[in-house]
From Swiss-Prot:
Protein name in UniProt: Trace amine-associated receptor 5
Source organism: Mus musculus (Mouse)
Biological processes per GO annotation: adenylate cyclase-activating G protein-coupled receptor signaling pathway; cell surface receptor signaling pathway; cognition; mating behavior; sensory perception of chemical stimulus; social behavior
Organism taxonomic ancestry: Eukaryota, Metazoa, Chordata, Craniata, Vertebrata
Cytoplasmic topological domain: 60-70, 131-154, 226-253, 308-337
PANTHER family: HISTAMINE RECEPTOR-RELATED G-PROTEIN COUPLED RECEPTOR (PTHR24249), TRACE AMINE-ASSOCIATED RECEPTOR 5 (PTHR24249:SF307)
Knockout-associated phenotype: Mice lacking Taar5 show decreased sensitivity to trimethylamine. Mice lacking Taar2, Taar3, Taar4, Taar5, Taar6, Taar7a, Taar7b, Taar7d, Taar7e, Taar7f, Taar8a, Taar8b, Taar8c and Taar9 show no visible phenotype or behavioral deficits. They however show an absence of aversion to low concentrations of amines such as 2-phenylethylamine, isopentylamine, N-methylpiperidine and cadaverine. Mice show less anxiety- and depressive-like behaviors. Mice display an increased number of dopamine neurons and adult neurogenesis.
Function: Olfactory receptor specific for trimethylamine, a trace amine enriched in the urine of male mice, playing a role in social behavior. Also activated by N-methylpiperidine. Trimethylamine is present at high concentration in the urine of male mice after puberty and acts as an attractant. Trimethylamine-binding causes a conformation change that triggers signaling via G(s)-class of G alpha proteins (GNAL or GNAS). Also required to provide olfactory input into limbic brain areas to regulate emotional behaviors likely via modulation of the serotonin system.
Family statement: Belongs to the G-protein coupled receptor 1 family.
Length: 337
């Protein structure tokens, strides 16, 4: 890092990330503020990793949870956990220091993993919406239509498509050669902002909003059908009524998860598009807040499950007790007392 005096800046020095031409300016925070931000980010990373790790463990360990919907939840939790484990620590340093100090290779890998895990999350939420739509709107055909094999196909697509899509933009020069007029503005040295250009702003918008529109339309239909079922539930047998209520409860919980996802990611996605039209005028601090608000979503789902799913709370209680070592624990029925 170096400090220089800019013309007209008086005595206020400007810091840079590297002692080279084209280096990014660096915002130097007081030590106390740095410590507070590092601690806050560390807590967020810890909640993200441990919360989603428990979801992965619970669905894998308890046999009663081996359902198509829960396998999708497991895969979603895995993406969020890996985001917290592999992406957020380096993002924390970049946010606090306002510079990237880990080299070009890690910059590209970090950007790849960041985009991969975030796109994987939205794909999985979209597939979960399809699952809930089928369970609520077509309950008689649901067991035969949405099997474990179907869920596994969705999981492969949910990871494979984002992996190929992101690799195409980051690890080939096809896009840069074909769209050079869109990519003239190169990031300064020390920013690690490989994808934030005008073309990516336009491309990122439909990648977010098309799945969102699908999810919103599916949940609107689910709401209409669930309301009708609530009026008819008195005429059903007790066992069938219980099954319908359980499916509606799951749809409601996952609908909340989708809603929180939209709220967390909407500011960043809209800003990316608008910023590309206005020649990137968003202050770095505001942009960083939008990014971390989106990251925060990865910590939300386990918290939602704690308040919404009795089986999740029961599994957590077993995990924190000696009963977890009992050979009978994996076969415990978490849905009933």
């Amino acid at each position: 890092m170096r400090a220089v005096l800019l013309p007209g800046s008086g005595e206020q020095p400007t810091a840079f990330c590297y002692q080279v031409n084209g280096s990014c300016p660096r915002t130097v925070h007081p030590l106390a503020i740095q410590v507070v931000i590092y601690l806050a980010c560390a807590v967020g990373v810890l909640i993200t990793v441990l919360g989603n790790l428990f979801v992965v463990f619970a669905v894998s360990y308890f046999k009663v949870l081996h359902t198509p919907t829960n396998f999708l939840l497991l895969s979603l939790a895995l993406a969020d956990m890996l985001l917290g484990l592999l992406v957020l620590p380096l993002s924390t340093v970049r946010s606090v220091e306002s510079c990237w100090f880990f080299g070009d290779f890690l910059c590209r890998l970090h950007t790849y993993l960041d985009t991969l895990f975030c796109l994987t999350s939205i794909f999985h939420l979209c597939f979960i919406s399809i699952d809930r739509h089928c369970a609520i709107c077509d309950p008689l055909l649901y067991p035969s239509k949405f099997t474990v094999r179907t869920a596994l196909r969705y999981i492969v697509a949910g990871w494979g498509i984002p992996a190929a899509y992101t690799a195409f933009f980051l690890y080939t020069d096809v896009v840069e050669r074909a769209l050079s007029q869109w990519l003239e503005e190169m990031p300064c040295v020390g920013s690690c902002q490989l994808l934030f250009n005008k073309f990516w702003g336009w491309l990122n918008f439909p990648a977010f909003f098309v799945p969102c529109l699908i999810m919103i339309s599916l949940y609107l239909k689910i709401f209409v059908v669930a309301t009708r079922q609530a009026q008819q539930i008195r005429t059903l047998s007790q066992s069938l009524a219980g099954a319908v209520k359980r499916e509606r409860k799951a749809a409601k919980t996952l609908g909340i998860a989708v809603g929180i996802y939209l709220v967390c990611w909407l500011p960043f996605t809209v800003d990316t598009l608008v910023d590309s039209l206005l020649n990137f005028i968003t202050p770095p601090l505001v942009f960083d807040i939008f990014i971390w608000f989106a990251y925060f979503n990865s910590a939300c789902n386990p918290i939602i499950y704690v308040f919404s799913y009795r089986w999740f709370r029961k599994a957590l209680k077993l995990l924190l007790s000696r009963e977890i070592f009992s050979p009978r624990t994996p076969t415990v029925d978490l849905y009933h007392d």
